[in-house]
């Protein structure tokens, strides 16, 4: 009984927290993460996609450990 009551209070609290922290409280669940949704629709907009990597055919390996190959396969040259 106590566990059920605690779970109910926790769910109500988390639901209220979602609406309070939303940008627009009227459409709280729709506008909760607008920037991330934009990055999912346009992957080129994500900052993590802008990484430094070496293209195929370029030397890589022991004397030159970084930047990594774009394909992540290095056998003396990026493949």
From Swiss-Prot:
The presence of a 'disulfide through disulfide knot' structurally defines this protein as a knottin. The cysteine framework is VI/VII (C-C-CC-C-C). Belongs to the conotoxin O1 superfamily. Keywords: Disulfide bond, Knottin, Neurotoxin, Secreted, Signal, Toxin. One of its GO terms (molecular function) is toxin activity. Disulfide bonds join 53-70, 60-74, 69-78. It comes from the Eukaryota. This is Conotoxin Leo-O4. One of its GO terms (cellular component) is extracellular region. Residues 1-22 form the signal peptide. It is found in: Secreted. It holds the Pfam family Conotoxin. The keyword Signal applies. Residues 23-51 form a propeptide. InterPro entries: Conotoxin. The keyword Phosphoprotein does not apply. Expressed by the venom duct. Its main location: secreted.
